[in-house]
């Protein structure tokens, strides 16, 4: 899927423990094939405004939302091919546009607005860059992904993400793969990606194992931690605002 540039699909997330994930992988063998790349490391550099406008809007669960990120498969250097991705979501359907270029070209394009080849995709990315003022690297995310696709429908995919790390410093794909963990070691984030319906065998497995969809977001989870830490530094000692789920509640704590 690394060479595909346009996507339209539904993406449904589930939180599993390792035992559930291994049980599902075993059952998947008759229906799905492992991606040829096996387990891969994905690095995503998310862009946002200085006040995190994009992720804040996303967390409000609007009908339409979008994210801009720079992605590599494994740690990059200046000559590595990376992908500038604009991910939009409208009424639960994901539309993803991306273009490939070197890390150095991507940095000059996104940070210094150097011209690139004019295409429909670059025009959409350019509009995003103009619409949100002062977009800059905000959060670096990395994780290990194991991907599978259906034997009879390559548009149906399942991915398992583990070792999800984040940081809001050293914001470059070339700076290494490290950061703070988002999930417990026993947890696995599963994503079902499909342009159509979920197969019955998958529905039966989820039902039998009482596995339910979640709205978990890697970037939003990292942002909640950033927000909480900023509140600790700036709030009066007797009061502090923290995120609970997608809402902000006031708690009396000691800073």
Describe each model-derived feature in a short phrase.
Residues 1-255:
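Phosphate-end processing signature that detects enzymes handling 5′-triphosphorylated RNA
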């Amino acid at each position: 899927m690394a060479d595909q540039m346009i996507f339209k699909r539904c993406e449904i997330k589930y939180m599993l423990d390792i035992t559930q994930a291994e049980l599902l992988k075993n059952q998947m063998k008759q229906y799905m094939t492992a991606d040829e790349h096996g387990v891969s490391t994905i690095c995503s550099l998310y862009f946002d405004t200085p006040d995190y406008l994009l992720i804040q809007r996303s967390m409000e669960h609007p009908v339409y939302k979008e994210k801009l990120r720079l992605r590599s498969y494994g740690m990059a250097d200046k000559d590595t091919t990376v992908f500038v991705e604009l991910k939009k979501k409208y009424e639960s359907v994901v539309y993803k546009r991306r273009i490939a270029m070197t890390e150095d070209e991507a940095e000059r394009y996104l940070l210094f607005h150097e011209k690139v080849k004019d295409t429909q995709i670059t025009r959409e990315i350019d509009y995003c860059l103009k619409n949100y003022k002062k977009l800059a690297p905000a959060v670096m995310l990395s994780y290990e992904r194991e991907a599978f696709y259906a034997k009879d429908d390559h548009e149906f995919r399942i991915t398992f993400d583990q070792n999800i790390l984040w940081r809001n410093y050293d914001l470059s794909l070339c700076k290494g793969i490290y950061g703070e963990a988002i999930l417990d070691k026993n947890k696995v984030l599963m994503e079902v990606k499909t342009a159509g319906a979920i197969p019955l065998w998958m529905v039966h497995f989820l039902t039998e194992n009482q596995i339910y969809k979640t709205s978990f977001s890697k970037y939003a989870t990292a942002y909640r931690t950033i927000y909480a830490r900023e509140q600790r530094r700036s709030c009066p000692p007797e009061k502090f605002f923290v995120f609970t789920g997608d809402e902000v509640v006031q708690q009396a704590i000691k800073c």
